[in-house]
Amino acid sequence: MEYANENCNGHASQDICVKGHDQQLDPLNWNMAADALKGSHLDEVKRMVKEFRKPVVRLGGETLTVAQVAAIASQSGTDVTVQLSEASRAGVKASSDWVLQGMINGTDSYGVTTGFGATSHRRTKEGAALQKELIRFLNAGIFGNGTESSHTLPHSATRAAMLVRINTLLQGYSGIRFEILEAITKLLNNNITPCLPLRGTITASGDLVPLSYIAGLLTGRPNSKATGPNGELLDAVKAFQRAGIDTGFFELQPKEGLALVNGTAVGSGLASMVLFDANILAVLSEVLSAIFAEVMQGKPEFTDYLTHKLKHHPGQIEAAAIMEHILDGSSYVKEAKIVHEMDPLQKPKQDRYALRTSPQWLGPQIEVIRAATKMIEREINSVNDNPLIDVSRNKALHGGNFQGTPIGVSMDNTRLALASIGKLMFAQFSELVNDYYNNGLPSNLTGGRNPSLDYGFKGAEIAMASYCSELQFLANPVTNHVQSAEQHNQDVNSLGLISSRKTAEAVDILKLMSSTYLVALCQAIDLRHLEENLKATVKNSVSLVAKKVLTIGEKGELHHSRFCEKDMLKVVDREYIFAYADDACSATYPLMQKLRQVLVDRALLNVDGEKDSSTSIFQKIKAFEEELKVVLPKEIERARSDLEQGKPAIPNRIQECRSYPLYKFVREELKANYLTGEKVQSPGEEFDKVFTAMNEGKLVDPLLNCLKEWNGAPLPLC
């Protein structure tokens, strides 16, 4: 854009006064909004992660991102620092000077010479006293001292709010001194965090009540508190000392109190934190769905590009392409194809919906989360107080940018998307632990030798049901519960912070579900490894016993029963190993029953041979079973022991898969162990390791490593 110099003498850095032709290019900002969604969601998440890890956040008013807000919120000043654009100083000073000059000239201006809200008909010439009273009466929050539950806003959310508020005020439309913004920056960089109440805002004339506590600290109110870098409680004097603010407490000038409190920073700051996590969780859900397809021996056809191209939705197409990339060349997929070809009737022609329609299910959720992210990024770069000081036109504009509807709406939508992701995750988890549906894995993913004394993930499934139920409840909207407030002046209000808080809860619950599910998938991977080793052992044992017992007759001649071996090995191939592995030679379990049936069927065809004991196959059945009972249990135990000692005969297929980085991270870095009733560890201990790592951001790199080779496009149709 080109800036028109003749009318923009107060805001030379702003794009308000533009030549008519340029203004007509995108006067409604729709092109800007559309451009922000170009490129893949995964590339955007990668950019967010990169921004999150930068050591400096430079504020100029218009380029703040949700990742930068999340970085400042979650890290101390020693990890990442805030720098203010010096170029913003002139515009900030111009608006501040304009307010003071207006007082001198006797200009009547809302919140400067008038009362507030429904009482704006009142007038005063005591501008500084009015700001002081504004902060006092807005300090109406309750911190709940003496109760078990905290009523204090999490310090990370407060840090996010401080950053966003600085960014708004830097744009020079609010009538506040630059020195106040520098003081808030010093608080951030020295990890001094004001204590704000958790509740009490409707985010409609902004987040008045919580923001007033930041103003209270800046003005040295006796009730104001802050926490230091180590969580120690500080009064205002000590907070200023620790932050290195040596100018003393601020005596607010006209409009400055209103500038500090009349904005949406608390709701949009928390929303930024939520969306940073939500975007990563969306990618995680795609990868976990692909791993689910691997361990369930799913048919990869569900990811075919043509299917999704014909549906047109970009989120669905990308979700399918990511899953397709994970499954392309997967050793599990190759093995599953062999299994399906060997016995096409062993499982349904089509996989169940939780697997087969996962791209269609996740795609819209990704689109919603991405759109919400862009909406919040516009909000955190907006000027959202009232009135706005337009120095260039010498006027104060009385409007309603403090209305936080973009926050409430985007957070309600995000929460619904998170609930849908959680519902899919629970459906997949339920299939995974159910031996009626999981294609040969043990019930409850039991990892021990004795399923009667090992109930695996049964407790985890109950917990997952609990998490999912709460998550579905949280999906209910907040924004349809508006109450008229402040003498019916604030008769519609956004409830933005309330919705952000509920969405933060939803993110937390989805992390609980994701942690549990990831450990379950790792368990399933190890069980497939055990299954493969045990099946090879059983086949080898059956083959050895068959050769020993069935090949030679009583007189050393070749026996007709030798032809049974091939059919017996087919039985082993087709029978689920965990259906009998705990007592392989039990007559009540399917292996022995079906091996015997092979011999019986062959004997029935051996009519003449059965008349002679030396050629009778029936006569061989008992000898075969007795010999197998001697050999097989020992060999199964040996195979288990070898695997437990890290010496399996067959390596783990996961090492040949693109999903391996996540598995390796869980097993090797976090030391989250294979679960079995034979060990002391409880499932929750292992889930906690993953949950903690997820909250610390440690899961991001292994997650993205699973997709590092993806070129951003589906496989070509050929």
Swiss-Prot record:
Pathway named in the protein's UniProt entry: Phenylpropanoid metabolism; trans-cinnamate biosynthesis; trans-cinnamate from L-phenylalanine: step 1/1
Source superkingdom: Eukaryota
Active site feature: Y110 (proton donor/acceptor)
GO-annotated cellular components: cytoplasm
Modification comment: Contains an active site 4-methylidene-imidazol-5-one (MIO), which is formed autocatalytically by cyclization and dehydration of residues Ala-Ser-Gly.
Cellular localization per UniProt: Cytoplasm
2,3-didehydroalanine (Ser): modified positions: S205
Keyword Glycoprotein on entry: no
Reactions performed catalytically: L-phenylalanine = (E)-cinnamate + NH4(+)
Activity control, per UniProt: Competitive inhibition by cinnamic acid (CA).
Gene Ontology molecular function, alphabetical: phenylalanine ammonia-lyase activity
EC class of the enzyme, as a word: lyase
Family label: Belongs to the PAL/histidase family.
Function per UniProt: This is a key enzyme of plant metabolism catalyzing the first reaction in the biosynthesis from L-phenylalanine of a wide variety of natural products based on the phenylpropane skeleton.
Protein name (database record): Phenylalanine ammonia-lyase 1
Source organism (scientific name): Petunia hybrida (Petunia)
Lineage: Eukaryota, Viridiplantae, Streptophyta, Embryophyta, Tracheophyta
Gene that encodes it: PAL1
